[in-house]
């Protein structure tokens, strides 16, 4: 991915997701309620952040998210094609996990966390932008001649030359 507006938007979404996860992690361990995020029974971050689904084997989900966003940010600093593939794969894993958590919020807890919704929006945007940053497979085949004069591209079956 070249360093253009899309690239900087990707970095910004990684930072946004990281900040949302960090705030959610702070709220997870905080004893005081979060007035800004507890609107009613349907939108209640404290309820979601302190539920049994807020941890995976004792590790807060918000910490997993924070580490994931840090990884995506680090991968987004590179313009390598290979790293772009890893970045897209990592974002797909993050999106799948965020969609699972949204399912838990909607159908099991019947409560939504505004920070979690923001994080879902961030990882969705990251996945979209990481996908845009991928180049078509044909770009991986070089058309430059090698030292021995043989071109490294595959023959085109449509060419009749």
Can you describe what each PLM-predicted range is?
Residues 1-159:
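Membrane-interfacial helix-loop segments of redox and metal-homeostasis proteins
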